[in-house]
Structure formats: C-alpha cells, structure tokens
C-alpha cells in the first residue's frame, strides 16, 4: 500500500485560459482542421466554465503485489472523493471525461509520462442554480443479491 498511484493537476486563475489557448484549442484545431472559429473558441475557453478545474491522472507505480487495475480504481476514487467533498462544501462540481481526457498529446503535455492516463477533469465552481438531475438506472436492474442455497 501507500503507493499513491495518481497525480493531481490544478488549473485556477489565468492558468485555465492559458492552457485552453495554448493546448486545448490548438490541439482541437489539429484534430478538426475544418472546425469553425466558434468551435475552436469554445475549446479554448472550456476551462473557464468553472473557477477551478482539477485533473486527476492515473499514474501506476510498478508493484509486485498490487495490480494495475487496483491502482486505476484508486485514481477513480480520488475523482469521486474530490467531487463529493466539493459538493458537500456547497460548490457545484462535475467530473468529466471529454475528448481531451483521451488525447495522448494532451496527456503527454500534462504528465510527460506515456504510462499515465487521465481519469477525469473535475470542474468546481459557484453554484448559480440547481443542476438538472441526470437519468439514473433503476436499482432493480443493476443490483442483485447473491444467496446461498
């Protein structure tokens, strides 16, 4: 234990816009050469939707007793805990994995490590109105009970 197989990168203040213009917008344009100026502008300003954006990175540490999968789960738990903590303090918070979470060029820029993977970006900000509740699965369809006979 105690490996901490994850990293946290915080974007706040001007770093949100700098990263957007220097990397997100530029990379989006490379991937979508026919994208409209409005679409590129949207990507450049994506991180401005919240006061703070937290990037959680799964960064497995070689270990003979702990499988990679468990380390990846640890990174996801970090995301969920940040989300729950922010919401419990009254902030609006959302965990997103959009195109840039899976882009190897963006991941390399952020981590400088080919083995790292982005677990998600958590947007945290002031709650202006109550967010819409998403459709959730019916518990009876996803929960079962094992009983020994």
Predicted regions and their residues:
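Small-aliphatic-rich amphipathic alpha-helix that forms the alpha element of a beta-alpha
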Residues: 54, 60-107
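Short, surface-exposed loop/helix-turn segments at secondary-structure junctions
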Residues: 26-35, 65-69, 109-110
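N-terminal amphipathic, basic helical "cap/leader" segment at the start of enzyme domains
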Residues: 1-49
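Glycine-rich, charged/polar anion/phosphate-binding loops
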Residues: 38-41, 106-109, 130
């Amino acid at each position: 234990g105690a490996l901490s197989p994850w990293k946290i990168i915080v974007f706040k203040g001007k770093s949100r816009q700098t990263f957007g213009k220097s990397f997100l917008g530029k990379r989006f344009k490379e991937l979508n050469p026919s994208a409209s100026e409005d679409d590129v502008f949207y990507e450049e300003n994506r991180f401005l939707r919240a006061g703070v954006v937290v990037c959680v990175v799964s960064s497995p540490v070689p270990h003979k007793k702990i499988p990679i999968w468990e380390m990846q789960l640890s990174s996801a738990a970090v995301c969920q805990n940040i989300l729950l903590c922010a919401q419990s303090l009254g902030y609006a918070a959302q965990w997103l994995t959009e195109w840039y979470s899976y882009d190897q060029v963006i991941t390399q820029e952020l981590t400088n490590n080919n083995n790292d993977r982005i677990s998600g970006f958590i947007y945290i900000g002031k709650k202006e109105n109550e967010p819409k509740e998403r459709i959730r699965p019916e518990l009876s369809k996803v929960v079962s009970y094992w009983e020994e006979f």
